[in-house]
Every structure is written in structure tokens, then in C-alpha cells.
């Protein structure tokens, strides 16, 4: 084994950044000199302002390129009617959110900051605290949601009440700029991050593509497609792989080279990306309720690996694609330009709020009557819900289970009304509710049979596909699972939710049990009382096509 001469290879060699920025301020930066070199001095206030503005912008606006991809669905003759319906709701939602009152999604996310600090940038220390202060200011001052739970011991938790802590990862690099990527990462998309430990045997053209397609299928619709999907093959460690997945899904590595070299540079496999996008379109899942647009795009990145390891990572950025770059240089503080006018992407003929035909359901009547009406319609039927709905999510269900396990039974409200799996953002002044879109249904699957056996949770409303145990429970007890569109939380708050009040557990914040009154609240029948599951039917249809 001969020794090669030393050669340093930048692991992620990126081309020039062509991101469009706007100048936030030229204050809080100055130039100095040290040992003959010019130094950029950055005051702590600059970091706080940067973080505050970046997370504000990302909470209410998305990138123009993303909005264009959504708009393209409306003009695609191959898109299903459900694809187009969901895309239109996303654009309407963005149009409302861009006003800066109701955030794009009710899950305003964990604040993640990746910073690369040039060696000739001096701050005097305390960078993490200054950035965290900016995150704090955003979540306190805007109508966002506090989603972070702090453990008091291994089992007891309390909401931090500020959305802190933020995840802040800072790196030292060459140069005289301080560059950032800020991500507001919701729980739904974060939970669709996976690591698979494979071997060299996977690395053949015949095996790898089929493997990735099968993994992609497991994503389901719970994280609000259309997705930006990222696959990473290889990595010097498991954590390097998953870190690359996160950044790739945020388009941070789009300017990587498209071929490798003997020194181990990361690269994109553009051809495999195209092939996988076609496969995603053929899955049939579409933009949540069947169709073509399961994904907007796919990124596939290849990394070097240890000979004994072959990590494969998969992750997504969801329809709330909240990623934003920022930087500080000698001119001042710069923030990536997001789309301030998403309404321009809505075709003129679709600007009115009419939704076409939907079955109107009056929820202010006995549960037996509501169930009897739903039983008349097949899965995939679009509904317009009107009346009272109970709102509760993870901790609320855990509280209800405690009651059942203790022999206390269920409160009457969980028997009399449908339950919506959700947790509201803060309510702006003059509004009935803050942004209030659905959370992932699957996390509540284990509770359904026990609840329905006692007459509760007979109609469930949430987002995404569910497990077989829910289908079985609904068939056994005569229940239904209705799908709400994951993503357009601002549309629901402005157009459908007429009142919001806390029913129980106010100390739990967004995890409390709430009651809402709704008008024309859109939903689809996804699981019925006869054992039919909309998503299983799609899978069977696709399998039949494969056999043919």
C-alpha cells in the first residue's frame, strides 16, 4: 500500500451563492485591524436582529421558487383534481400568511440555526446567546406557537413558554463573513427523518433505486406533501449523513458538483434525482389525497464512507418549506428575500373562494345522526364541516387514557363531538383563533380502539395516513377518520374557525383540550365504518398497475 501525498479536499465544495438578499441594516458592524489584517467586528445586537428577522420572515413567507412549484401544479394537465385543490389551498394560505399576522403553519417549529463564522469576524463571544435572544423575540412578539417541552425529570415535562431552546450549530471557516441558514422545523417533517445502516451490497444500479423508492413510499402523507425529499448515500459517520440530509432538504447543497473524485468530495446524482421524481409521481399518493404531486423535487447526495459502513439517510422539507439564509458582512446584515406577494401565483379565475361541490355536514346534532350521514358516502368524499369540534392532541389523549385506565370513563364532550388533532398558535387581536392546522394522525393510533369502545372519538379529523388498527377500530365501532389538508393553517383560522375556547388543561398551552366552532371546514373521508381506507385503496391500485 503506497502512501499518497497530502491533499486537502473541501468535503462540500459549493459554487458561488446566487441567493438574492435584502439589506436589513448597516448598523452594528464595523471594521478594525489586527496584525495587519482587516477585521469585521460584529456587535451582539446584529446577531439578535438577524435571528429575529430571519425567523419572522420564514414564519410568514416562503421562497419564490417553492411558490412557483406549487403554482405549476394548477397548470399541469396530469395533476389530479385533489392535487390542484390542495395546491390552491396552499397558495391561498400563503397569501394570507404573507400579511404577517397568521403564520403559514400552526406548528411554527423548532428554531434551528447553522452558522459559519469567518476567521476574520470578531463578535466578542456569546454568539449562541445573542442568536437565541433573536429567536426568543420572534416567538414572543409574533403570533407563533411554543412547542418546546423541557424535562423536569425523566417523565415529567413542562412547556418552556418561549419556544426555546433553539438548536444552534456554529462552525469556524475562512473569510470575513458570517453566514447562516435558519430553519423553522415542524415536528411532522422532522419525524420523517430516517437513518438506515446498509452495506456495499446496496450500491448497484439495480438495487439502489428500488430501495430508495420503497423507503420513499414509507413517508406517507402525514408530513404535508408535496415534499422536497432528500436522500444521502454514505457519510463518514451516521451524524454526518443525517446532517447532510437536513441541509440538502433545505436546498443548501444544490450547488454541489455532479460527480465525485478520488479525494471524497460530496456530489449530487442529478440523473438519479430525475428518475426518483418520476417514481414519486407514480406512487399515486399525490399532494395528500391521491394524484401525481407527492414531491416537488428530490435531492440525492453521495458521500465518502468507511469500508465497513454504508449509511443511507432520508428526510423531507414539507409544504411549509421554512428555510432562509442570512449573512453579515462589512456592508451590514442581509436576509434572504422570500416571496412577499404569493397571491400573484393564483390564477385570476381561481381567486374567488368557491371550492366546488362538497357534502355539507351539520355537526350540531346527535353523533348517531352524523355517523349515519357519513356512512352514505365512500372514502375520498369531500366534506364541508359546520358546527362544534373538540381539539386535542398528544398530551390530551394521554390524559384521556389515564381517565379510562383509572375507571373514570370519558368526558361527554369527547362522545358528543368530533375530535380534531391540533394545537393552536397564538390568537392575534381581532381573530377568533390563531393558525390551527392538523397534526399527524398516526401518533394517536394506539388510543382509538379504547376510546371508541367507550363511545368517544367516533369521528377523528387530522392529517396523513393511519395504521391498520385504526381501520379495524372504525369498522368494529362504526367510526370515521376524516382527513384535513396538512399545511394551510392560516386559511382555516381566517375562513373556517369562528370561535376557540379552552375546555380543559389550560396549563398545557397548545396541548390543552379546546373547542372550536367551524363553518365550511374542508375535510375528506379517509377511513370509513366499513373497513375501507383511502390510502390502502391507492396502494392496491398502484400494485395492480405494477402487475400489469
Swiss-Prot record:
Cysteines joined through disulfide linkages: none
Record's keyword terms, sorted: 4Fe-4S, Iron, Iron-sulfur, Isomerase, Lyase, Metal-binding, Tricarboxylic acid cycle
Induction (record text): Is expressed under aerobic conditions. Is repressed by glucose and anaerobiosis.
Keyword Transmembrane carried by entry: no
The protein's role, per its UniProt record: Catalyzes the reversible hydration of fumarate to (S)-malate. Functions as an aerobic enzyme in the direction of malate formation as part of the citric acid cycle. Accounts for about 80% of the fumarase activity when the bacteria grow aerobically. To a lesser extent, also displays D-tartrate dehydratase activity in vitro, but is not able to convert (R)-malate, L-tartrate or meso-tartrate. Can also catalyze the isomerization of enol- to keto-oxaloacetate.
Family: Belongs to the class-I fumarase family.
This protein's name: Fumarate hydratase class I, aerobic
Organism: Escherichia coli O157:H7
Lineage of producing organism: Bacteria, Pseudomonadati, Pseudomonadota, Gammaproteobacteria, Enterobacterales
Amino acid at each position: 500500500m503506497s502512501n499518497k501525498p497530502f491533499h486537502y479536499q473541501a468535503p462540500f465544495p459549493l459554487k458561488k451563492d446566487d441567493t438574492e438578499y435584502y439589506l436589513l441594516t448597516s448598523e452594528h458592524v464595523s471594521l478594525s485591524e489586527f496584525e495587519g489584517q482587516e477585521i469585521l467586528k460584529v456587535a451582539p445586537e446584529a446577531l439578535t436582529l438577524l435571528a429575529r428577522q430571519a425567523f419572522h420572515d420564514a414564519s410568514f413567507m416562503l421562497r419564490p421558487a417553492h411558490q412557483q412549484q406549487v403554482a405549476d401544479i394548477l397548470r399541469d394537465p396530469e395533476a389530479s383534481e385533489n392535487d390542484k385543490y390542495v395546491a390552491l389551498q396552499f397558495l391561498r394560505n400563503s397569501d394570507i400568511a404573507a400579511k404577517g399576522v397568521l403564520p403559514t403553519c400552526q406548528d411554527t417549529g423548532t428554531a434551528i440555526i447553522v452558522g459559519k463564522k469567518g476567521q476574520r469576524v470578531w463578535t466578542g463571544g456569546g454568539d449562541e446567546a445573542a442568536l437565541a435572544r433573536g429567536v426568543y423575540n420572534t416567538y414572543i412578539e409574533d403570533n407563533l406557537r411554543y412547542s418546546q417541552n423541557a424535562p423536569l425529570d425523566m417523565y415529567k415535562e413542562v412547556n418552556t413558554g418561549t419556544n426555546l431552546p433553539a438548536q444552534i450549530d456554529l462552525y469556524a471557516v475562512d473569510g470575513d463573513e458570517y453566514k447562516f441558514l435558519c430553519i423553522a422545523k415542524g415536528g411532522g417533517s422532522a419525524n420523517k427523518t430516517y437513518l438506515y445502516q446498509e452495506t456495499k451490497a446496496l450500491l448497484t444500479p439495480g438495487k439502489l433505486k428500488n430501495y430508495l423508492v420503497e423507503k420513499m413510499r414509507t413517508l406517507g402523507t402525514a408530513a404535508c406533501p408535496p415534499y422536497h425529499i432528500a436522500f444521502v448515500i454514505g457519510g463518514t459517520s451516521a451524524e454526518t449523513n443525517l446532517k447532510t440530509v437536513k441541509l440538502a432538504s433545505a436546498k443548501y447543497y444544490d450547488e454541489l458538483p455532479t460527480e465525485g473524485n478520488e479525494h471524497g468530495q460530496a456530489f449530487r446524482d442529478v440523473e438519479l434525482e430525475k428518475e426518483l421524481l418520476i417514481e414519486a409521481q407514480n406512487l399515486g399518493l399525490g399532494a395528500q389525497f391521491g394524484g401525481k404531486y407527492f414531491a416537488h423535487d428530490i435531492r440525492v447526495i453521495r458521500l465518502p464512507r468507511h469500508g465497513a459502513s454504508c449509511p443511507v439517510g432520508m428526510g423531507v422539507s414539507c409544504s411549509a418549506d421554512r428555510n432562509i439564509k442570512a449573512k453579515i458582512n462589512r456592508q451590514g446584515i442581509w436576509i434572504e428575500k422570500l416571496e412577499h406577494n404569493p397571491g400573484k401565483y393564483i390564477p385570476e379565475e381561481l381567486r374567488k373562494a368557491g371550492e366546488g361541490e362538497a357534502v355539507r355536514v351539520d355537526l350540531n346534532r346527535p353523533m348517531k345522526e352524523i355517523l349515519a350521514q357519513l356512512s352514505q358516502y365512500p372514502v375520498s368524499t369531500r366534506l364541508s364541516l359546520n358546527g362544534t369540534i373538540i381539539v386535542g392532541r398528544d398530551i390530551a389523549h394521554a390524559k384521556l387514557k389515564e381517565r379510562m385506565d383509572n375507571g373514570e370513563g370519558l368526558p361527554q364532550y369527547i362522545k358528543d363531538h368530533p375530535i380534531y388533532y391540533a394545537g393552536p398558535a397564538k390568537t392575534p387581536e381581532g381573530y377568533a383563533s390563531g393558525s390551527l392546522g392538523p397534526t399527524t394522525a398516526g401518533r394517536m393510533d394506539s388510543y382509538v380502539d379504547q376510546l371508541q369502545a367507550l363511545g368517544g372519538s367516533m369521528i377523528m379529523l387530522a392529517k396523513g395516513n393511519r395504521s391498520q388498527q385504526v381501520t379495524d377500530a372504525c369498522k368494529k365501532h362504526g367510526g370515521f377518520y376524516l382527513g384535513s389538508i396538512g399545511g394551510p393553517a392560516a386559511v382555516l383560522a381566517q375562513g373556517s374557525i369562528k370561535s376557540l375556547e379552552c375546555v380543559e388543561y389550560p396549563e398545557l398551552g397548545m396541548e390543552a383540550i379546546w373547542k372550536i366552532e367551524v363553518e365550511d371546514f374542508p375535510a375528506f373521508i379517509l377511513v370509513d365504518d366499513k373497513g375501507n381506507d383511502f390510502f390502502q385503496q391507492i396502494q392496491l391500485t398502484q400494485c395492480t398497475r405494477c402487475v400489469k
